């Protein structure tokens, strides 16, 4: 089997590692928040895999076909054809990115304040939009320790799901959201068996099941590799089965549609499409462009199919696993096995001297930038925010530092530099300090908050 990447590189972007004293000054000027750093001060950027990947020659050439008509553009119909072919959903709404899809959906599905939205685990923006719409997000993730092997750590705890529905009543639940892969749990996959059982429960109680499918192709790859009965199935066939169990989807296309901007909503039901479309039009744009240029729709249509290529998926997941193996062999505590898009360091174990409400995952992001110019992000109690009723910080089941790898961008030599940075920080971990707020926004606070070291 070939060991190289399944592509050649046609264009490059220079990067550099600025001196240590400049990194110290840059992160201080950014109020110890990596989101507020300038990209020119970052050596290797693992903040997110969202919109940071490299597009293919086929996507770039497709952009030349972009139809910029305000309504009924041919680019929309090419995108719709791709979405329907992969998902089986006939009713498709583009949005400017995933947040536009989330806002539009929850604005219609949460019909009164206090309704619950249940999930295997929400990501930050999804959780935020549930709350902004007046809903209450509830995580029902399968409980497995980070160091313990489980092939599908992203699974819904279906026993807890059904118990919650029975206790609170189906009429008080707006919908169920199945996140594939499960980003906040470490980019962990969800099994087809778990999706099927979640669908059965949703049907039993008459509750909508929506997929959050930013990384749907990676999830299909894990099913193919790890679940009995799927080894000989093509990723697109696995995707079609997966989507058959739901009522619709929300998507940030900036991940597994391999584009720099864009989002999607798609539904089986025309009535649901009409309701949600009523929010898309005033906030995103007309139904056939959703805030995007025609050229972006064209690139998305191509990328959705490219992401299901088995050679690409083997490379993609294999590169993440390569970094995970480098760290694990050095004794770094990580979520194991690694997920599809990122390595998640268990910051609570990496920095046991920092209490959870001083955000060890964020403290480690600061240290990794100072040590090697590597930008990462916290996925833990900082991202969880505050309880809207009590005002107290919500404690996450995980305190992660996420190293998200952009698609088709970095080589394994770059990842070796990342591993060296993490290992160096680990060797001086007792010197790493927690953080406290000096400015705390009320919603999605981690993006723009200011911090100081404790």
From Swiss-Prot:
As its record notes, the protein acts as a catalyst of: L-tryptophan + H2O = indole + pyruvate + NH4(+)
Q: In which pathway does it act?
A: Amino-acid degradation; L-tryptophan degradation via pyruvate pathway; indole and pyruvate from L-tryptophan: step 1/1
Protein keywords: Lyase, Pyridoxal phosphate, Tryptophan catabolism
Which cofactors does the annotated protein need, by name?
pyridoxal 5'-phosphate
Stored PROSITE patterns: BETA_ELIM_LYASE (PS00853)
Q: How does it assemble?
A: Homotetramer.
What name does the UniProt record give this protein?
A: Tryptophanase 2
Q: From which source organism is this entry?
A: Symbiobacterium thermophilum (strain DSM 24528 / JCM 14929 / IAM 14863 / T)
